[in-house]
Amino acid sequence: MRKRDIFLLLGAVFAITAMVFVQFTTESIETAAWGLSFRQENTAPIGPANPEELARFNAAYLGNTNEKVIYLTFDAGYENGCTEKILDILKKHDAPAAFFLVGNYIEKNADLVRRMVDEGHIVGNHTMHHTDMSALDSKEAFAKELTDLEELYRSITGQEMAKYYRPPKGVYSKDNLRYAKELGYHTVFWSLAYVDWNNDSQPTPETAFSKLIPRIHNGAVVLLHCTSQTNAEIMDELLTRWESMGYRFERIDKLFN
């Protein structure tokens, strides 16, 4: 086979491979539940959609992996007495965070929400009813879940809600990502979390540290639940240990700059 023919053949193979890869990365986020695959300690995990594809929709799960930065985020659908302690510890460490809240939380905990805002944290949109957003059949239904929460937040704080959205339970579709972008939102996933949400079966501090210390990594977007008794108990030591590893904390608005 002549050299010219070999190059033509290789070019065709490359083109087909590229087409298959693009099709895979696009289809991989048609509908999905967010999950992570960790390869080695203190290294960023692999998500179900790659960062470049997510960036097309103003979405991200990971920051700059060349910088020792952590983005703290908390999800909450209700309050059980842990958030005030967590806020105290964040203030002690001068650590900004984002709190993704649902309607029920904002309605019943106006003072805590206002404290989050007053102390420089971001309050993000976790939808009005914590519904499966991928199951909604229209952009209008999707938008209503976000705008209803925006209106509630405005009535409590007198401010506009920051345009950061986290899908309930990490379940999403490509349509959801597109709708969020069209509504001016950034979709925020995560690159580190652990099973801290079950109040009937809280992990021990030792279990929590065994997940959160070896898996921390540059540019980590950390998801924790501020309903967790364990998180409230370990937060001071956790932030101290991460700081001793050379990490600093930044707000998620820096994630998209």
Predicted regions and their residues:
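Catalytic grooves of carbohydrate-active enzymes
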Residues: H217-D253
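Short amphipathic alpha-helical segments
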Residues: K85-I86, L177-Y179, M235-D236
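N-terminal pre-catalytic segment of deacetylase/amide-hydrolase enzymes
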Residues: M1-T73, E79-K92, T207, L238-R241, ...
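Metal-dependent polysaccharide deacetylase catalytic core of the NodB/CE4 family, i.e.
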Residues: K68-I70, N80-C82, K91-E206, S210-L223, ...
